Amino acid sequence: MERLFYPKVVAVIGASPQEGKVGNTIMKNLRNFSGTVYAVNPKYREILGFPCYPSVLKIPENVDLAIIVVPAKLVPKAVEECGRKDVEGAVVISAGFKEAGIEGAKLERELVEVAERYGVKLVGPNCLGMINTEIAMNATFSRVAPEKGRIAFLSQSGAFILAVLEWSKRNGVGFSKVVSLGNKAMLDESDFLEYLAKDDSTDVILIYMEGVEDGRKFMRVAKSVARRKPVVVMKAGKSQSGAKAASSHTGSLAGSYEAYRAAFRQSGVIEASSVEELFDFALLLLKYRKAGNLAILTNSGGPGVMAADACDQFGVPLANFNFETIRKLKEFLPAESNFYNPVDILGDASAERFSRSLQILSEDENVDIVLTILTPTAQMDFLKAAESVVGKNAVCCFMGGESVDESERILRSSGIPNFFDPVRAVRAISVLGRYSKISAKERVKEDLDVSVEREKAEEIIEKLLESGGRVVGAEGLPVLEAYGIEVAPYGIARNVDEARDIAESIGYPVVLKVVSPDVVHKSDVGGVKLNVGENDLEKAFFEILSNVEGRMPKARIEGVLVQKMVDGGKELIVGMKRDPQFGPMIMFGMGGVYVEVLKDVSFRIAPITRREAHEMVREVKAYRILRGLRGEKPADIDAIADLLLRVSKLSLDHPEVLEMDLNPVKVFESGYAVVDFRMVLGEEV
């Protein structure tokens, strides 16, 4: 990777003297490169003052990096020649690969085979190129070269990079490295993250992501990197239409957005919901890393109140000043001022009043960072105010237009972010708390307190698969029991006499449910009877059979589940779905028939730790209900966490289990019981 970012000799294969051609723009962009540049084009001997050769093989010295801009069908041959020349890396700008359809995908596979054969590291294809500002290497066809900075930017979209580079020029944002990933035929986000973690010129890493192909690799790498440097991701393709567009854009597998969110959370990656957030977070994290208590200092009550409200919205704690701070403020501020947080120094405040107040707040041991909000009054000298902010732990919200331009330049040169909107400023500050609390810390491996019977579960699953079972219900409950998961007492009856024997064994009242691989929602077809007593059992048994046969005549009925009626408790859902990119994804939420409407659920990628299991429970809105409301007894949270851990382990041990729904699970003051269950079996995704 070092040669990709720090080449001494670069060859542009497909260089052109013709204005407007990509090969021409790249040659122009490399004029300031600190190394040597060669053009490759059989038609010319010189392009823009650079020596030109008919093939990379003819260049009279070793080449470290090739930039390839020839038509797609010629790219494999160009990479083969690079391999024969011992070129270590190639950036393939050319489009027309897997993003273009079946033939393009075939060509991309051929390209990768050639690169692997010769050990050439590929960036792209279908990308904008790469930038390393440290050595003035702009190997892209962007018209704008970014300023030097401490932000590295990885993006699947080249066009997005073009827009960002222009914006960054206007806003004084610099970059260390910029990489357009394109189709990621060989090198992907994870590979570049590993390199950038060790890059001394990079402090913050930003990623525009449409999808990853190896989600577990990304999690493993991101978790390691995020412990050292903030990683902020903007994920596109969240909706079905967005995912479809992402797929057609770079051939990405967008996967489940819930899986990505869970992966980011577990890896310590900060997710930005917009371009604005992406760079707001980056600018804050460049300057500060420590989360803490915020003081608000303003010359206008309204914006101060906006900021205080935003603190509540985004979870930013407001500082409680010590008595000495309040005493010092009262010594010189007008009596009408507000001496508490937010501090309002009034609309007639001068820069001197502002500066003195800021100094006092900065000296308070309870204050970690100050948000300074100033509006353009006749009394306020923004230049002096900006100078007093330099050197302080502060974020500015200098509200105005031309009157704040010069002061903004002073702030920018010191790396102090300035926002027009107080709410946006607080939202940006909130990232400091998020970064300090991320779950990127080393996770301790936790063993289950009770061992599981993996081989027993494996035998049951094999028998179910041999019998042709794909969607499995009650007959799969022994799999749960093998993993120590508590199931309400039950039995499966093939006739009414068996049903009666089971009911007498487990005790009345009971629940009867149809057992059929074709019936998913049993209550919708009359396949469930609740609170069945001894005298009602026979009638209920035959009513279930009649109801299902009448409403789903083609359904295969394999029996009737007879289960102990479980009263009381709160209904939960625990589930697992195997994501194509990330593997088993564990779900938790409030259960029952309304789960699809309420969608009060949380997700994690397996394996999960006990701490993460508890986090999943706390994240749902209904957590307060589980804690106990209005004198109700609290639910057994530890038992729920244990259940989640067991489902996580089951999903990892048995890749042929594609999906599981434990719904509902009844949880009590002590313990829980799985009441209904569905499992989908098949080949691993």
Swiss-Prot record:
It comes from the Archaea. GO terms for molecular function: acetate-CoA ligase (ADP-forming) activity; ATP binding; metal ion binding. It is an enzyme of class 6 (ligase). ATP binds at residues 503-514. The keyword Nucleotide-binding applies. Optimum pH is 7.0. Signal peptide: none annotated. PROSITE patterns: ATP_GRASP (PS50975). Residues 477-513 form the ATP-grasp domain. Optimum temperature is 77 degrees Celsius. It catalyses: acetate + ATP + CoA = acetyl-CoA + ADP + phosphate. Its EC number is 6.2.1.13. Catalyzes the reversible formation of acetate and ATP from acetyl-CoA by using ADP and phosphate. Can use other substrates such as propionyl-CoA and butyryl-CoA, but not phenylacetyl-CoA. Seems to be involved primarily in the conversion of acetyl-CoA to acetate. Participates in the degradation of branched-chain amino acids via branched-chain-acyl-CoA esters. Homodimer. In the N-terminal section; belongs to the acetate CoA ligase alpha subunit family. In the C-terminal section; belongs to the acetate CoA ligase beta subunit family. This is Acetate--CoA ligase [ADP-forming] I.
